[in-house]
């Protein structure tokens, strides 16, 4: 689809030479070559006059590409082996190359790898210029030698415009060139030759005749006879409700340095956040919020209600972010169904009509994007019965109609976000704002799923939760917005799977607090009250603000929806109380173990089982201090200010290699401290375009150079050590008394393997696979150890949270003697300030928590964590409320500016 869609959006046609499409498999037929869904392939439309400029970009980035065709004024698509404008539109019909220079690759060193880019270039339609007529779609960067970054946004250098994104694998193997017989097709064949309207013209509307399926004969849950204590444990252990930490910690959530809210919340770092927030830039608090809603199980009973609930849940999740108006929210709808299966088409129609023709228009919500997957069924025969007819497969799996809604909205000030972390004030209440307005429907609920009915079937049936009044959702949104604006809310968590009980427990887990849950006036049935999954949220309000909050609820016409339901306590106990009676009581650890059970089981199967056990033991410790920072300096003090005021801006090379992805945030950190950051690719050094002699500092950035296939950082380091000119350049730089260097993450791994040419680096370890046998992305607590490091002067003794993201961060010393001689600069510690030796406080298993080292004179420092991603307090997953806007980690970079003086 990529090439035709790009041409169609530009109002042109194209001639594509299939011989030019890179492929490692010469046997592919034209159909397979054209229609396979290879990943990481991008199409770019490049003006022919600028193809050489584009080729230079690819060469610098070690990125293979191929020019595969030309755009034409006639809206006609032609693709074939040897297809050219001349062969299609006249002339001899012989093959011809794409007009303009058409290099076949951008990997001068022969190292391959990376993402291949195919460039679709050619004459502009109607004799004009594509840039002028169609506008620029993609901007590629071509920094000159050591081009000054200026602002981090300028790190890419001067932009070369390119229209249309494509790509392919590496260049063809030897012997597969023009004229080769691919899949039996003749070299001159044009297997694709058709007007663009055939692909993109308006097709006739599809008409389908379908009927609703019969109502499922599941039993309905009868709460009489259920045991409340056991029900709470079962609900928390259900995979839908249970903790998802095992999924969260394997994904890098801090890369880019613009994250303002990720899944983990609070000093104990539990994955209970309602939404994600990213910042729009390095110098603003404005940004974007994202949230998801889905209630697919309800579609088994009522597909329209399930769709409305998905939209509603996306909005209630998004309310944790400071979104100003509902009309700024945009939705993406991902529809899934088993089209053609008995009755599913009718259910899909019900769901689409409910959302697209009723709910969203009522709320002025737009759904500008989305996708559909309408083949959500599979059938197979296990071969047990050879006599079974082909029309009756032995097994069939059919997915219910499902809608996953992603909501996006701008936020003006990300610092005013709300999380489920409860404030530890003496007098606070937890209020439930329930949009069911007293309805407590249990159909399709997790409570129903964990209690079998007749014949061991889940007691799943009954009325399902629904968004009965769309304007009530609008009132809820505006209530939360106004209460936040007035400073009335201390914490927020939406009610969803598992009901209010699950939401309350997650707030208690994240805060290491107990709860007294009061049922007075909340309904006659404690099971329906606690476990119904109607839309809503729980908010924490200080006692002194009760009246103001109640008044605000009344002004938004939600009085019948709001009720005080719980109070936080410092005891490790959760109780459900009605009047003077305690209906159920759980130990905090008992509930937490149930909630953590799924994550622990999955982690134990996937990772080092000992690490999974250690994390569970640490997470369930109610008395654990969590992240407990300690400052030994004033982070608000800008020690570099006098030197920055002189106007001098020393030059720092922001060094990267193929696969490195942390250069933007590294440049930002140095720029904020008064340096000039320059984007330096290793290919610049290899080609002689840049020399390190022109820089005072060097920063080797994080990422995955060469995909870590030779070991983290090893390929990068070897590319220096095995090239005499580069080895001499780096050795000369490190030998200078006026130079400094910083290596972070992949850069740390790389510099550690250059220690033979770094004076004073004797005893540095190499960094190997984490003890957990897994990539670890967490917020950890670091202590600054007394050392010669120029980056850490005046920070000694401080304990600071920092982003961690690596798979090979365990320091491995050649001997105990070398470890004793190593100049340790940073180490992981626990909340008590002791060296962290246990997982996950020590996320990689390094001895004595060692994670940062320096040289004898302190000019070169390496560390595995990412201080450059957290130069602002807002970048930290959690920080004390009284910290200034500038993170303590900014002092590192300011110290370097002071040293350069």
Locate the predicted segments by residue.
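Glycine/proline-enriched, intrinsically flexible loops and inter-domain linkers
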Residues: 1-90, 179-697, 701, 706, ...
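Short acidic/polar capping segments at secondary-structure boundaries
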Residues: 49-50, 73, 84, 436-438, ...
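Short glycine-/acidic-enriched loop or helix-start segments at secondary-structure transitions
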Residues: 54, 441-442, 549, 664, ...
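Structured loop/turn residues at beta-strand edges in well-structured enzyme cores
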Residues: 63, 693, 737, 848, ...
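Intrinsic disorder/low-complexity segments
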Residues: 87-188, 390-391
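Active-site glycine-centered loops adjacent to acidic/histidine catalytic or metal-binding residues
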Residues: 494, 745, 866
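Amide-donor transfer/coupling interface in amidating biosynthetic enzymes
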Residues: 688-690, 731-732, 764-901
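Cysteine-nucleophile active-site neighborhood
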Residues: 704-789
